[in-house]
Amino acid sequence: MTALSGFRIMMPPGWSQYRVDEEGRKRYIAKVSSRMKQLGQPELDVRLRMLATTQWRRLEQTRTHSIYLADREVEGLTHLPLSIAVRQQVAPSGSTFAAGLRTLTTAEIVTFDTAIGPILRWEWTKPGEGELEGIAVRSVGYGFALPEENSRRGLVFTASLSYPDDADPLLVEAAIELADSIMETFRWQ
């Protein structure tokens, strides 16, 4: 997979980028495994490695390029279980990037006009099922069309937050605000 280039985005302290390839998967799983060993949770280590491998396959299937997440301790900061994935998106021939996003979601897409151009945003919440019952996932999508007339191409970022059904709603909203703030730093180069 080639590197995505032509943009920059600022992540908070303690966040890392992982490419969605074999090297990135190994690096991520090693990080998760190391953390679980530090916590003395070998059973959880095995479950999380299996879950991470399954999730990595899904990311590969959707042609996700990279994920960003908080994976390092930073004194004075509390990290929420938020991750952000990025992938290239090309609309079907004869369509624009914005119109092509309809193939990704049934949620309402809202357009925000900004100094760098329109930002397309949509969100949805999915309740947990089966083994994940009681754990919801709230996701927010952000679309950035290439800054060219009637562009069919652009980038899609998806921020995802997993949380228990009884989580403090203020913390959930704070995580979504953090994702919105991160996306506000996006710039084409």
Regions found by a protein language model. Give the residues of each.
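Secretory pathway targeting signatures of secreted, lumenal, and periplasmic proteins
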Residues: 1-95, 125-127
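Short, well-structured beta-strand
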Residues: 83-189
